[in-house]
């Protein structure tokens, strides 16, 4: 059975035993407030669904996730729960395996998101990095 929720910054699709969460926040799929809220909600739903045996996180467009949304820096949206570290805890504590499908440039918080998953797969054009360390920011 296929179930889909196609509106919003994260698209949820359940195809049989696999839940696919697609970050859909153009142009680079940043971890903006709405994305964090939607990811957390869908992760919790998939973890509670007895029919779901595994979860895949991918990105629409050219990459998985470009990291934090710099437009939210120094704004109240930056502190809205769940914060990125809360998402990492949800990923790591999941009883179901979570796979990050990495493609394109996956940087900063996007790489941290992928590292929080149990498994990672990448296409041959994927690139990863933590550019914030060049500015003295510790991930």
List where the protein language model places each region.
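Glycine-rich beta-to-alpha active-site loop
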Residues: 91-135
